[in-house]
Amino acid sequence: MGAPPGYRPSAWVHLLHQLPRADFQLRPVPSAFAPQEREYQQALLLVAALAGLGLGLSLIFIAVYLIRFCCCRPPEPPGAKSPPPGGGCVTWNCIAALLVGCAGIGVGFYGNSETSDGVSQLSSALLHANHTLTAIDHLVLEMVERLNEAVRTELTTLEEVLTQRTELVAAARGARRQAETVAQQLQGLAFWRGVPLSPLQVAEDVSFVEEYRWLAYVLLLLLELLVCLFTLLGLARQSKWLVIVMTVMSLLVLVLSWGSMGLEAATAVGLSDFCSSPDSYILNLTQEETGLGSDILNYYFLCNQAVSNPFQQRLTLSQRALANIHSQLQGLEREAVPQFPSAQKPVLSLEETLNVTEGNFHQLVALLHCRGLHKDYGSALRGLCEDTLEGLLFLLLFSLLSAGALATVLCSLPRAWALFPPSDDYEDTDDDDPFNPQESKRFVQWQSSI
């Protein structure tokens, strides 16, 4: 099948499409995009389940590490105030992990923006295609109404005026038959009229889902950013309660990161299968939803010299009929108007209607050509298979960096918390120190008493 203009499957599409797939019984599953097949659905669920497996392993590792830290920690000698060896290394490991998490957040914001741009391009292509299809229906309806009105009024009046000349009446009736032929042929060109599938509705649904997806990822990114910043603040101020709260929040964000990773991985794999060969699936789905013939769908989705225009015969007959009407009106204007002056007004009105109809007909021919809709199809594929897929991969990288950084933080924070000095140590500060909290409190009380 011919590829849409400007679209070629990317290297990421080929790489993800070649990954092996298996169902729940670990039997191989073809990589062809078939979301309606149960085995293919199981294969995507299994890809998402790998993230759940990673979450379980990371939680087990964190639990074992913390249990070992709590149970196997050597007792501190009484009266010891100096931190044990390696304490600074633990703190710096935690800070490094938080910085990696912050870098992952930047990657996540970029990936979220790329995904949103790709979906926006898809929606714009659908809206433009809907505009083209609506314009075709509108032009056909307008031309048919004009021709029917001309048959009912001007041509009927012209036949009544020319009753004394049978050959002129025959010419007027010939123009009537030609106008009826054009109207009949034009009605068959509005191929999208009555089709239940609306590109406008699809674009609105896609935009609605994308708004909530974008917002959900922004909230997740902001939540992780706040966790990283407040954790750094807790380490800097050696605040035990803040570190405890951030430990709980880090565990929550860790679960969310692994969950988003599974969703992103399954979506990226399924999207790569679709983008590797989109024509066949789109053709079959559109034919099922619209009931249109395969000749029309092949013409617009493929748009190459091997596929003929299914409307060419109707367009040719309509153009010939319009040319015949034009020649007949010229003959009537030349023969009938000098003998029947009252025939001039309907003849001029018919010529005006014919000129407007011919202009609309040329515009309709341009809209019916496959170039416009095929260009929209290619734009939609580029948005979905390039920008959106690239954004998903960046979001997948963000989730991976986030999961690794938060797992490291969860292992490091309890050890860093254990190194914080007890609250009694803060009471040993110099009474003359202006930054001493007790001294500051006494200073405020002294000012209020003045």
From Swiss-Prot:
GO terms for cellular component: chloride channel complex; plasma membrane; smooth endoplasmic reticulum membrane. Belongs to the tweety family. Residues 427-450 are annotated as: Disordered. Its main location: membrane. GO terms for biological process: cell adhesion; L-glutamate transmembrane transport. Signal peptide: none annotated. The record marks 165 as: Essential for the formation of the channel-pore. Pfam families: Tweety (PF04906). Glycans are attached at residues 130, 284, 355. Calcium-independent, swelling-dependent volume-regulated anion channel (VRAC-swell) which plays a pivotal role in the process of regulatory volume decrease (RVD) in the brain through the efflux of anions like chloride and organic osmolytes like glutamate. Residues 1-43, 110-214, 262-390 are extracellular. It is found in: Cell membrane. N-glycosylated. Contains high-mannose, hybrid and complex oligosaccharides. Disulfide bonds join 275-385, 303-370. Homotetramer; disulfide-linked. Homodimer. GO terms for molecular function: intracellularly calcium-gated chloride channel activity; volume-sensitive chloride channel activity. InterPro entries: Tweety. It comes from the Eukaryota. It catalyses: chloride(in) = chloride(out); L-glutamate(out) = L-glutamate(in). Residues 65-88, 236-240, 412-450 are cytoplasmic. The keyword Membrane applies. This is Protein tweety homolog 1. The modification Phosphoserine is found at residue 440. PANTHER family: PROTEIN TWEETY HOMOLOG 1, TWEETY-RELATED.
